[in-house]
Curated annotation (Swiss-Prot):
Gene3D superfamilies: 3.40.140.20, Methylglyoxal synthase-like domain
Name recorded for this polypeptide: Bifunctional purine biosynthesis protein PurH
Keywords: Hydrolase, Multifunctional enzyme, Purine biosynthesis, Transferase
Organism of this sequence: Stenotrophomonas maltophilia (strain K279a)
Residues annotated as domain MGS-like: 1-149
NCBIfam families attached to this UniProt entry: PRK00881.1, purH
Length: 527
């Protein structure tokens, strides 16, 4: 049986990250804890005027091989693995003293190998051997030993000691043990991923494959969800171990009901779409598709234009802004429509105060950040599809005019706006746009011409005038029928990737209808 409270009399400290080290060592010494340490950690403690015993004095064996061997010794691992009541005699026979607390973080393999100029030799030298071994020994023996692996745990460690008269509870020891095993798993995964990607070792900086032979991923649980995609499915949200700044995983929920699986999926689509724009923008998403997108003079203007695209679909949608949300716009939204989630990089205090009148509305803050996800993944039966993220932008200079008529300056602006939106619409995707706002969106149809027709129907239902608008298509037109449908609706310019066997027919259709057409040479399928 695990004793609930066990005293801490002897601690071994060995850290690469010296953050908070002196403060922790000082606090432990003040509580009468004997300190053992190694190398640079011992020096830092000693320089702070604290008494510390070198591990070499405990083992009777000096550090050797440039520090590669220093703690791989029975006097250390016996002190960590010894079981109270079972191993007391053998420990006494061999003079092994119990170690009650291990404070250790590992060589910085991840940060070293993240550098573009990291050599294979640098990577190898930052593979910790003794550290993970000690962590595993201490974590396995949580019945008697506590282990801390990160400076963020120090405050909790000291608070627990103070609350229990210099002792640590079984629940604290177990929680720290789990954290230690998780850290070792993360560390080993990073090493495996790095070395599995190395394809050539003849250069100082090794050649590495984009997709390693083995992929080990680590995710940290953020929360349980109300349910999965449907109420009969359970769900949870996990984030990357090191989330990219500015992405959904960095959100803070300020109010509202529990988030659902669909809430987060839609929130990600809305946020990734809106953060493309520099000017104030609003994106309204329903079932992972933008149903209204606009750039405006401010939040209120952008919202009104986005909402007008498809007021019916906006009901119960997710609304995202790329600028801090003001109180006036928040009031208009919450007074007008039912909204599942509001997203913005920040909020005026008055906006948050007003949102409290609708307590169920989920309000998310996602701090600004220019980071982009490098990879996208999708589970298939017993497998994982992994690809580089579709972060490809487009500028006017990259567009190729293929029609007899060239777009006007205003049409070029609208074409690039529509192209940005089309990237976030489920394929087959068609976007009608004018004046930096969507006029109609046709999403997820098996036939491209039907997406074009639906975009026109959406515009008509919203009493929006298509005449003079532009059209974006996420992929090439296999036939001219999509161009014919667009021209009949009043479209005057088209942006599409090109690349169809019938490009000549499609271009001829554009010329026949007096449409300007540009090719991007880039496809934006989204499934």
């Amino acid at each position: 049986m695990t004793a609930d409270l066990l005293p801490v009399r002897r601690a071994l400290l060995s850290v690469s990250d010296k953050t908070g080290l002196v403060e922790l060592a000082t606090a432990l010494a003040a509580r009468g804890v004997e300190l053992l340490s190694t190398g640079g950690t011992a020096k830092a403690i000693r320089d702070a005027g604290l008494a510390v015993k070198d591990v070499a004095d405990v083992t009777g064996f000096p550090e050797m091989m440039d520090g590669r061997v220093k703690t791989l010794h029975p006097m250390v691992h016996g002190g960590l693995l010894g079981r109270s009541g079972l191993d007391d005699a053998v420990m006494a026979e061999h003079g092994i003293g119990a170690i009650d607390l291990l404070v250790l973080n590992l060589y910085p393999f991840e940060s070293v190998t993240a550098k573009a100029d990291c050599t294979l030799a640098d990577a190898v030298e930052n593979i910790d051997i003794g550290g993970p071994a000690m962590l595993r020994s201490a974590a396995k023996n949580f019945a008697r030993v506590a282990v801390a692996t990160d400076p963020s745990q120090y405050a909790e460690l000291l608070a627990s000691l103070d609350a229990n008269d210099g002792q640590l509870s079984a629940s604290t020891r177990f929680a720290f043990s789990v954290a230690a095993f998780n850290r070792v798993a993360q560390y080993d995964a990073a090493i495996s991923n790095y070395l599995s990607a190395v394809t050539a070792t003849d250069a100082a900086v090794p050649a590495r494959a984009e997709y390693p032979a083995q992929m080990n991923s680590t995710f940290v649980k953020v929360m349980d969800l109300r349910y999965g995609e449907n109420p009969h499915q359970s769900g949870a949200f996990y984030r990357d171990l090191y989330p990219v700044p500015g992405t959904l995983a960095t959100f803070q929920q300020l109010q509202g009901k529990e988030l659902s699986y669909n809430n987060l999926a839609d929130a990600d689509a809305a946020w990734e779409c809106v953060r493309q724009f520099d000017a104030p923008a609003c994106v309204i998403v329903k079932h992972a598709n933008p149903c209204g997108v606009a750039v405006g003079a401010g939040n209120g203007d952008a919202y009104e234009l986005a909402y007008a695209t498809d007021p019916t679909s906006a009901f119960g949608g997710i609304i995202a802004f790329n600028k801090p949300l003001d109180a006036a716009t928040a009031k208009v939204i919450l007074d007008r429509q039912f909204v599942e989630v509001l997203i913005a990089p920040d909020y005026e205090p008055a906006a948050l105060e007003y949102a409290q009148k609708k307590a169920n509305v989920r309000v998310l803050r996602i701090p600004h950040g220019d980071g982009l996800n490098n990879f996208d993944s999708k589970r298939v039966g017993s497998g994982l599809l992994l690809q580089s993220s579709d972060n490809r932008g487009m500028t006017r200079d990259e567009l190729k005019v293929v029609s007899k008529l060239a777009p006007t300056d205003k049409q070029f602006t609208d074409l690039l706006f529509a192209w940005k939106v089309a990237k976030f619409v489920k394929s087959n995707a068609i976007v009608y746009a004018k004046d930096n706002r969507t006029i109609g969106v046709g999403a997820g149809q098996m036939s491209r011409v039907y997406s074009a027709r639906i975009a026109g129907i959406k515009a008509a239902d919203a009493n929006l005038v298509v005449e003079g608008s532009v059209m974006a298509s996420d992929a090439f037109f296999p036939f001219r029928d999509g161009i014919d449908a667009a021209a009949a609706a009043g479209i005057k310019a088209v942006i599409q990737p090109g690349g169809s066997m019938r490009d000549a027919e499609v271009i001829a259709a554009a010329d026949e209808h007096g449409l300007a057409m540009v090719f991007t040479g880039v496809r934006h399928f989204r499934h």
